């Protein structure tokens, strides 16, 4: 019977990786894990290989250089589809997404093609962010919703579960976003493809180990992207 696959893109996540993989395995023991490492200078990829030698459910995909979150996930999606996994998860490696929520997202896809972890709905929330970042995230989501004309409340979120059939019809070859704008574009293309999409409340906790990969350039990319999508230029 096909099993789920959890994609974990990494860049300098050595301090989180062992405990995070253990938490994913405990929460969803039937799932395989694919660590997608962008040649991390801190040895994350090496550690991932060590873990994989001890656990047959863990695989590692090494990429030569850091090319952005979007390209890492696209490589992971291609890997998953080639191997006929039933579901494919996106999740951050720094515990900002709680692995205990994996079963809830999986259950939500019984009646949907894509389950989105949502911070901005009743039952969801965010911990550890300053007011400035909270405001920026809320503004970014509202901006994207208004420009794209969709009702979903967390277009920028990165905790997702796709059914394989949904990924196969999404048009992955059309996705152009390299960085975090990928999250907006992937959800937008899912909706445009007619996929059934549901939101599941999650609690997001800011990382305590390692450094955030977010930047001002990330925000600018998203601002431009939504207009490109709206005008059909992406």
Predicted features by range, described:
Residues 59, 63-82, 87, 99-180, ...:
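Acceptor/aglycone-binding surface of glycosyltransferases and processive sugar-polymer synthases
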Residues 15-19, 42-51:
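Acidic helix N-cap motif at the loop->helix transition within catalytic regions
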Residues 37-46, 65, 95:
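A conserved acidic beta->alpha catalytic loop
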Residues 151, 174-178, 187-204:
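Catalytic donor-sugar/metal-binding loop of nucleotide-sugar-dependent glycosyltransferases
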Residues 30-40, 61-62, 91:
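Short beta-strand/loop segment that forms part of the nucleotide-sugar
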Residues 13-27:
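Short, well-formed alpha-helical segments that are part of the catalytic scaffolds
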Residues 3-5, 32, 185:
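Cell-envelope/extracellular polymer assembly enzymes that use nucleotide-activated donors
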Residues 193-234:
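C-terminal catalytic/acceptor-binding lobe
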């Amino acid at each position: 019977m096909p099993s789920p696959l959890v994609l974990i893109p990494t860049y300098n996540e050595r301090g989180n990786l062992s405990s995070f993989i253990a938490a994913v395995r405990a929460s969803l023991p039937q799932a395989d894990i694919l660590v997608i490492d962008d040649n991390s200078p801190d040895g994350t990829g090496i550690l991932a290989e060590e873990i994989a030698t001890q656990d047959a459910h863990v695989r590692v995909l090494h990429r030569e250089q850091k090319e952005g979150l979007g390209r890492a996930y696209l490589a992971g999606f291609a890997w998953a589809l080639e191997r006929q996994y039933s579901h494919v998860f996106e999740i951050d490696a720094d515990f900002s997404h709680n692995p205990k929520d994996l079963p809830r997202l999986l259950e939500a896809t019984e009646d949907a093609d894509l389950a989105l972890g949502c911070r901005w709905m009743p039952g969801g929330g965010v911990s550890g962010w300053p007011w400035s970042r909270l405001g920026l995230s809320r503004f970014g989501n509202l901006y994207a919703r208004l420009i794209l004309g969709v009702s979903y409340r967390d277009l920028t979120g990165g905790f997702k579960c796709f059914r394989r059939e949904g990924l196969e019809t999404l048009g992955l070859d059309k996705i152009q976003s390299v960085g975090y704008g990928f999250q907006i574009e992937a959800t937008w293309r899912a909706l445009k493809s007619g996929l059934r999409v549901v939101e599941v409340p999650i609690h997001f906790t800011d990382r305590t180990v390692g450094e955030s990969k977010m930047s001002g350039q990330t925000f600018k990319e998203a601002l431009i992207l939504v207009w490109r999508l709206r005008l059909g230029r992406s």
